[in-house]
Regions:
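Structured mid-to-C-terminal alpha-helical surface segments
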Residues: 1-53, 65-69, 75, 81-340
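Glycine-rich beta-strand-to-loop/alpha-helix junction loops that act as flexible
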Residues: 55-59
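Betabetaalpha-Me/HNH-type nuclease active-site subdomain
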Residues: 62
């Protein structure tokens, strides 16, 4: 991928435009996909940090596991807690009381903030600077919109005018943290769309990294939906939330549910982990189990979710599943799963 980065902006644009047709993607999406992949490669090859990172979330489902056909605009990466000094006896779970456990989680958050905004930011800036062209315009900085101060933004060197496909932000969001559980994981490869189309134009078209298993991600998604079902009606639903229902639909539709549902111990581990590290007074993670798991949205959220799903149409490749079809499959799966 590094040879491609050395091409001029105009040369890269020709490749991006030549890739856009078959997948029904705009060239600017192809461009962003390349920079998402390249940023991942650089991040996981940082000498001090790479071995302590794991890739997870929606982008892993599209780029690594090929389960969803939705363009993801961010990178979700977790840092191993033990690397930050919170392993073994210092694990938050090992705290003698709930108060001590929460104190350790806050200390972990502070350590993670310092590492991301300090050494990791500096190292990634140096790595990017050593690879991109000297005449390319780019920046890497902390995301001021993240109240947790654990997100970086890479404003990549674009080959297109800013007024084209304005809905596509010319930045890769790198969402990080250290609260996630890294088990189970596997090593997988990913490839930019432009390299899939023009493999001979890349000396290194793909890259390997550690990624959270797809079954773990299945249960992570399920518990996200479970918590949403129990969200109080007076609390606003997060923006772009319909994507989680769409992703879960695809995980069921593509057969991941079959391998995940025989691993109920993994569901229990996810629920227990979230009850500590993502504590909520209303999420009812204790009920995220066979017989009481809820992945269907509550009735009063359907209208907003339908509208949100419609707004996200441009982020899908090809024809996305209809909202009613998503809801029908989730309803069927929930009913069958909860039969005891």
């Amino acid at each position: 991928m590094d040879d491609f980065v050395k091409l001029s902006a105009e040369e890269r644009r020709i490749f991006f435009e030549g890739t856009s047709g078959p997948k029904n993607m705009e060239a600017q999406i192809v461009e962003k996909d390349f920079w998402v992949c390249w940023t991942l490669k650089e991040l996981f090859r940082l000498a001090e940090f790479g071995e302590h990172l794991i890739f997870k979330g929606g982008t892993s489902l599209s780029k690594v596991f090929k389960v969803i056909e939705r363009f993801s605009v961010d990178i979700d990466v977790s840092i191993d807690r033990s690397y930050l000094g919170f392993g073994g006896a210092n694990e938050p779970e090992a705290g003698a009381s709930n108060k001590e456990k929460q104190r350790r989680i806050e200390a972990l958050k502070a350590a993670c903030q310092r590492k991301i905004g300090g050494d990791l930011l500096t190292a990634l800036q140096a790595a990017i600077k050593s690879k991109v062209r000297h005449d390319d315009t780019w920046s890497l900085h902390s995301d001021d919109d993240d109240p947790d101060r654990q997100t970086l933004l890479f404003d990549y060197p674009t080959s297109f005018a800013p007024d084209t496909a304005a809905y596509i932000r010319r930045a890769v969001k790198i969402e990080m943290g250290a609260r996630a559980d890294h088990w189970p994981s596997e090593t997988k490869t990913f490839t930019p769309y432009v390299a899939e189309k023009f493999p001979t134009g890349f000396r290194e078209p793909n890259c390997a990294l550690k990624v959270l298993s797809v079954e773990r991600t299945f249960w992570e998604k399920a518990t996200i939906l479970h918590a949403e079902f129990h969200r109080p009606a007076d609390k606003a639903m997060p923006e772009r939330f319909s994507r989680h229902y769409g992703d879960f639909y695809e995980l069921i539709h593509k057969g991941v549910s079959k391998s995940a549902t025989i691993k109920l111990d993994l569901l229990a581990r996810v629920a227990q982990h979230k009850s500590l590290f993502f504590k909520s007074s209303w999420a009812k993670y204790g009920e995220a189990a066979k017989g009481t798991l809820r992945v269907m949205p509550p009735e009063h959220r359907l209208k907003a979710l339908r509208e949100d799903h419609q707004k996200m149409q441009q982020m899908f490749f090809g024809e996305p599943p209809e909202f009613d079809k998503i809801i029908a499959l989730l309803n069927q799966w929930e009913s069958e799963f909860n039969q005891v």
